[in-house]
């Protein structure tokens, strides 16, 4: 018997191959979008940290040892920042820790920077 078409089994195997390939493409696209969201959040949080560091420098105040908290609007979202001074071995220098979160009581910060300032 001379068949000119595909058998049902061949069609089912071809569909399975295309379905698996489609799932792999969808998974890759989903991971890519997730990474883009993470990078956007991290970038915006870093900008908030940098804004607050510039503000701290402009005010030229010696930071205290307790946390100072506040919020800032950027890109349609409220970012919650806090900073504190940390004593160093040299009294003329102080470490400045700054954190940014997406929620006031979020467990871990989106961005954290430690820098040093002088009197």
Curated annotation (Swiss-Prot):
The chain crosses the membrane at residues 6-26. Residues 1-5 form a propeptide. It comes from the Bacteria. Keywords: Cell inner membrane, Cell membrane, Membrane, Methylation, Protein transport, Transmembrane, Transmembrane helix, Transport. Pfam families: N_methyl, T2SSI. GO terms for biological process: protein secretion by the type II secretion system. The modification N-methylmethionine is found at residue 6. It is a single-pass membrane protein. It is found in: Cell inner membrane. GO terms for cellular component: plasma membrane; type II protein secretion system complex. Cleaved by prepilin peptidase. Type II secretion is composed of four main components: the outer membrane complex, the inner membrane complex, the cytoplasmic secretion ATPase and the periplasm-spanning pseudopilus. Interacts with core component ExeG. Component of the type II secretion system required for the energy-dependent secretion of extracellular factors such as proteases and toxins from the periplasm. Part of the pseudopilus tip complex that is critical for the recognition and binding of secretion substrates. Belongs to the GSP I family. This is Type II secretion system protein I. It comes from Aeromonas hydrophila.
């Amino acid at each position: 018997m001379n068949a000119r078409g595909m058998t049902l089994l061949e069609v089912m195997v071809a569909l399975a191959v295309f379905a698996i390939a489609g799932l792999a493409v969808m998974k890759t696209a989903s991971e890519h979008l997730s990474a883009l969201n993470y990078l956007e959040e991290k970038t915006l949080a870093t900008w908030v940290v940098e804004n607050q560091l510039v503000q701290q420098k402009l005010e030229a105040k010696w930071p205290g040892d307790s946390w100072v908290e506040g919020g800032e609007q950027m890109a349609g979202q409220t970012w919650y920042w806090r900073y504190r001074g940390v004593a160093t071995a040299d009294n003329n220098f102080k470490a400045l820790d700054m954190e940014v979160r997406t929620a006031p009581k979020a467990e871990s910060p989106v961005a954290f920077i430690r820098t040093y300032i002088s009197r």
